[in-house]
Structure formats: C-alpha cells, structure tokens
Amino acid sequence: LWILAKAGQAEYIYPRAKARGNLIKLILPQLSILMNETMKKILNYINGEMMAPVGGNYFENINPATGETYSLIPDSDSADVELAVAAARNAFEEWSQMPKEKRSGILIRISEMIRENLEAFALAESIDNGKPLDLARTVDIPRAVSNFHFYATAALHRSTPAYAMESTALNYTLRTPIGIAGCISPWNLPLYLFTWKIAPALASGNCVVAKPSEVTPMTAFMLGEVCIKAGLPKGVLNIIHGFGHKAGMAIVSHPKIAAISFTGGTKTGELIARTAAPMFKKLSLELGGKNPNIIFADCDFDKAVQTSIKSSFSNQGEICLCGSRIFVERPIYEKFKKAFVELVGKMKVGDPLDASTKIGAIVSKPHFEKILSYIKLAQEEGGKILTGGKTVNPGGVNKNGFFIEPTVIEGLSYDCRTNMEEIFGPVVTIMPFDTEDEVLKYANATQYGLAATLWTQNLTRAHRMAAKIESGIVWVNCWLLRDLRTPFGGMKNSGVGREGGFEALDFFTEEKNVCIRF
C-alpha cells in the first residue's frame, strides 16, 4: 500500500480494479517495506541488517508511469562497499563450510518466501520499472523464485571428474568457492536477473556483494527483507544501492572481490573489463544485443506473426533478447508486414497496472529520450514508419509518464545506424530478403551476437542456419523458451562467458586438481 501511495495511485486503484474486474490483489504481505512509512528511504542490506548509506545521501526514485518521485535511493559509495566486503569476509568461512544440504535449505526458503509474496513483488516491480503488472506477475517474479530453487538443488547434484592412471595414481577435481563475488544487474528485468546472478554464487558457497540498477532498486530492497526473515546468515549477501560510477565501480575495483558478474550495456562492460582484467578477476559480462528475427516463407505463418509481436515488444522492447531486426523472405513479405503492422497498431499503451495494457512505460526519462532520438534517426536515414513512432499521453495520473507507441520501420539499409546500434525499446525494423546467404549477411552484420530467431519448417535449413548465425542463442520456431540447465551468453560484443546451468556454478568456483599416487 505504501508503494501505491508513493506512486500516486492508491486513491484510485481500488475503484479501477473493481470496475475492470481484473485480479489485482492488494494484499498486505509480511514485508515491512509495505507496512512501515519509514521505508520511504530505501536502505542498503549489509551484514544482515538494513542500514542507511554511510554518507547519508540519497537520490530520487521515479515512477516511470507517472513521472513522479515515490522513494529515495541510497547514494552509496566506496565506504558502503567496504562495510559490505568486511561483512562478506567475516561470513565466508562459516557459509563456505556449511553442509550443502543446509545451504540449499536456506536458499529454498528464500525462494518460497518470494513466491508467497509474489503479488507484492510483482506490484513493486511494475511500479518501479513501468512494465505491465501481468508481465511481472507471470514472468519476472516466478523466474526469481525458480532461480533460487534451481540453484539450491543444482548445487546438491554437481559432480566432478576423476581419472585413474593405470595403477599409478588417481586424479580428481575439487571445485572450491572463489570467496566474494560482485554481482551487478540491470534495470530491465530487475529481480529476474539480480537473482540469476546471486543464487548460483550463494549456492556455490560464496558470499556476495551485489548492486541492482539505480533505476529499479525496489525489489532488490525487498529481497533483503526476505533474506532476513529466511534466516540467511549475516554477511552472506550484501546489497548496495547507488550509481554505477560510484558504488558499482567500487565493487568492481575492490581487491577482495574475486569475480564480477555484470549484465548491462557494452560500453559499461568494456569499462568493467579494463578495470577488473588487470586485477585478474574472473569476469562474466552479458552485454548488448541487436538480434535478428528471420522468417522464411515455409514458416507457420500465424505462429510466426504472433510470436514476433512478443519478441519485438515484450517489456516495451527492453529485453536484450528482443528481435529488433525482422527479415522476411520476399514471397511472404507483404503478407507478413500487413498482418504484423495491423496487430502492432492494436496494442494498448498505457497504465502498467491496467490488465489490458500491452506496452507499459519506458523505464526512465533519459531512456525515453534515447528511443525517440533513434526513431528520428531512422527517418533521417530514409526509414518509413509503418505504425507508431509517437509518444503517448494516457492522461490521469499517467499524464507525465514516459510512453511510446510500438514502432515498425521499413525502408532502411541493413547496415544503417538504426540497424546496427542497440535501441532497447519498442522499435523494430523490417525488410525482405531473397536467399539464405543474403539474410546471413544481414544477420551477422552487427557488432553484437546475443540471440537469433528462425522460422522455418525445413529442419535441414534450421540446422544449417543455426550453425552459421553468429549468436550465443538460436531459437527455432519459438522465442524466449528457456531451460535453466542451458548456457546463456553472447558472441562478439554481446559479452564474455556464460550464465545459466552448471556454467554459472563453474564460474563462481575454482577448479583444483588432486593427484594421489597409489
């Protein structure tokens, strides 16, 4: 209720929910964030306690759907990071030597408590990020639940190889925790990606100093509350809020932090690598994407159209995996374009808490302005806007929010700036192709190589194309169908290393070979 009030929406949410007949449940969760007025200031979570930043400074947290300030974020710096690292060092011995079953049990309790308070987390995520409430409720928060549960159990079943040397010796491998891990996550899928880094690090026996995006800190703050209630030992997880150039870089450059897992922009990833590599830290960097969505004439047409809507505009297009470049084989180009544009034009843009909303608010004013600048650039480069391209004013409490119509642009060259640079918003380009070689040239032309989508009924072609596309993930006749056991990451400037599955457990541990002579 406090979040709603601070978001400027408490006074109208009840009648709106009742009138629409949707299932917004304004429960009172067992989280002090929703019950305590003093929580208007978000706090750091250090050594098992909520605490103000050492410097006492805060900055505003904006609700992107209203444009209004609704909470204050700690402006943490190196002093706060020092406290967090000290707490993590003190906790490491006990946590790393704790039986795996006991560690697993604590992480499962955290998972269960997030699930029990799913509605509160989803509401907070929607208000903080601008995404539709239904998306937060059905995707983001359930995935956070799964992240903790998956790694809590995966760590119990991890095995390592052993080799016998013909009656001479036995070699076996130990995997030991690295110590303290630094985890820095982005604003687009806040709790989803924050927990995807934290969970494997903790499950491997490490302690963590983590920083969520300063744009969307709320659910990370709530996670700290959950960890206290779940009985996570003090100092095992420490959550620092603040700007990347201060708190974030203090984490990256700290000599006692052995590994950095970062998801965000490629330029920031480059800066992190320049800082951390000379210190010989382990690095996992999941960076930008400019993903191709390739549609052949033999596709399942209706499914390709419907799924392309999702892969283009889910979460306002603010997902690194969105297919922002659509390439359609010429025989069905006009048919596909007509069907696609017609459906895009019907997508409702507006209040994220409205159950009928498909496109919510852009996460911040600077990002809102960046997206608009790219729409203008596309027109300057000769692009024709087939639908969208304008800002939206939903009125009411959302009159000052950051809303943009889903936008489809035609007529651009494959190698123009609009098609080469990451926009990260509800903007896609569409163009025809004639041959496999041609579309491979288009698909692989960017500096990025994160994901790609193929639509074809020809299995031979699917295998052939998947092998030649320069990306870390290729979906065939689907999009964002994820198995937590599989590796996740990109090629080229889309990153270094892999997250997900046992690869994440490998990253947060060091291998040690032991050789015993018979």
Q: What is the role of each PLM region?
A:
Residues 1-35:
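Intrinsic disorder/low-complexity segments
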Residues 67, 103, 125, 148, ...:
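Residue-level signal for inorganic ion chemistry
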Residues 69-76, 90-97, 183, 293-296, ...:
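Short, well-ordered beta-strand elements within core beta-sheets of diverse protein domains
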Residues 259, 267-413, 476:
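ALDH superfamily catalytic-core signature
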Residues 66-72, 257, 294, 348, ...:
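Conserved C-terminal structural/oligomerization subdomain of aldehyde/semialdehyde dehydrogenase
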Residues 68-158, 168:
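Glycine-rich loop-to-alpha-helix module at the N-terminal edge of alpha/beta enzyme cores
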Residues 35-64, 390:
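Hydrophobic face of amphipathic alpha-helices that form TPR/SEL1-like repeat modules
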